[in-house]
């Protein structure tokens, strides 16, 4: 083994800034600094129905494990997603979980590298299009980093579609409040001010 295991359940995020609207199991993880993630650092990565990657208590000292994608501390593992109400229970395992890791092992000047992402659907066309190709860009960069070449040029296919705007659940909540309460309140205040001005005249 290479020092990691996969959790039995799926990861659910409760921080509204880190999941897709109304889908707390469609995760928008924190992107850690690494050569592999440099190209997508300013983008969102969408990880649907992902499992936590957990480090084993002990593994060979020749192995180095580095986090690439992580949840917030508010995430938890849902062991029964088919019957879930998507709310954290008292016995839920919580914390910041790895969703993507880079594993390297060097033995006798020979290096083994594994890059592991825990969402089987992250490269589906629908998921990738939702974030304007950031997932496929990350995968391409990961493959490039494992190739024994100085430089690999990756030319993405040209798209005639518009770039998608990605909103987190938190952003949706904020704009809902502004639309439902903020704008009408401003209009009422303006109306009162106009009425008072005319009354004085």
Q: Residue locations for each model-derived region?
A:
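Acidic, S/T/G-rich, low-cysteine, solvent-exposed domains in lumenal/extracellular/periplasmic regions
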Residues: 1-151
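Short, aromatic-rich amphipathic segments at membrane interfaces
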Residues: 122, 129, 154-177
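Alpha-helical transmembrane segments
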Residues: 185-197
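Short, charged juxtamembrane terminal tails flanking transmembrane helices
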Residues: 199-201
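C-terminal target-recognition/interaction regions appended to catalytic cores
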Residues: 179-183
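Low-complexity, flexible helical/coil segments
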Residues: 150-157, 191-193
């Amino acid at each position: 083994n290479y020092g990691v295991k996969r959790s039995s359940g799926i990861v659910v995020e409760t921080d509204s800034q880190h999941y897709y609207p109304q889908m707390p199991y469609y995760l928008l993880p924190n992107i850690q600094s690494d050569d592999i993630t440099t190209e997508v650092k300013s983008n969102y990565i969408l990880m649907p129905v992902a499992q936590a990657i957990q480090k084993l208590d002990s593994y060979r000292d020749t192995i180095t494990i580095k986090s690439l994608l992580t949840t917030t501390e508010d995430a938890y593992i849902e062991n029964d997603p088919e019957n879930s109400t998507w709310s954290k229970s008292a016995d839920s395992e919580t914390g910041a979980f790895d969703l993507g890791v880079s594993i390297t092992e060097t033995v006798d000047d020979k290096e083994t590298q594994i890059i592991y992402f825990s969402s089987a659907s992250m490269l589906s066309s629908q998921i990738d299009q939702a974030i304007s190709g950031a997932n496929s860009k990350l995968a391409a960069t990961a493959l490039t980093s494992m190739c024994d070449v100085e430089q690999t040029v990756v030319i993405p296919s040209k798209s005639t579609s518009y770039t998608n705007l990605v909103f987190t659940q938190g952003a949706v909540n904020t704009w809902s409040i502004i639309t439902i309460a903020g704008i009408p309140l401003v209009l009422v205040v303006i109306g009162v001010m106009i009425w008072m001005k005319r009354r004085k005249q």
